[in-house]
Amino acid sequence: MSTPEEYTGKKNKDEMPDPVGWDAIDAAFDKMYPGQDNPIHFGTLIPWRLGGPDPLQGVSAYDGGDYFHLVTYGLSDLYEKEGGDPEYSGYGLEFTLKLRKAGYEDEMSELKCIASIFNDVARLTFENGEQFYPDEYIYTGQELGFDRQQKSKLTGFITALDEAGTIDTPNGKVDFVKLIGATDAELKAIMEGKLRVRELAEKIGDLTDYTRESVI
C-alpha cells in the first residue's frame, strides 16, 4: 500500500457505522487463528472513494507459526451493501496469501510488499472490472521476483480457494481467493497448456515460499 498505516487495532472500521462485512471477515479468520484478536494490520489513510491511491481499505496478517496468512478488506462490501448482485457482496471476493517465514529478514517490509501487491491486483478489478476466481493464473511478465528484494524466483501467481472458503455475510457471499506465488517457467507451462493450475498447486502447495526453486 502506498501510504500504509500500521496498527494492531482496526481503527478504520471503527470510524464507520455497522462494519458488518468487515466483522464477517474478522470472524472467519478469528475462527482459524483463535486468540489473535489484534493481528498486524495495514490500513489506508485516504479511502479510494475520496481520491486515495489504494482501492483496499485494509490488509491483516495473522500469524500461522511458520507463515503469515494475509487477507484483504475492500473487494467486498464492508459496511452497507453497495453492489448490485443480490447473491454476492461487492465484487464477491477478498484476496488471501500465506507467506512462509523464510527468505527475508524484515518481516514487516515483506508484509507491506504483499499488501501493495494486493492493491495492484485489486486495482484491476476496481478500474477495469476484472474478476478473479480460484484455479486461475496471474502472469505479470516480469523477470524479477515480486518480493521486496526481488531475489526470489516467484514472478506471478496461481489462485485457489482459501481454506476460509466462502462465507455468508449480511451483504452477501464472499469467496476467499488465495494467491500462491509461482515462477515464470511454471506460469508459462500453464499458458502453453502443458500444466493445469490445480496440478501446479498440488506440486508446490499453498504457501508462497521465496526460497523454493521452480518445479518446471
Ranges and model annotations:
Residues 1-82, 86-91, 95-216:
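Acidic, proline/glycine-rich low-complexity IDRs
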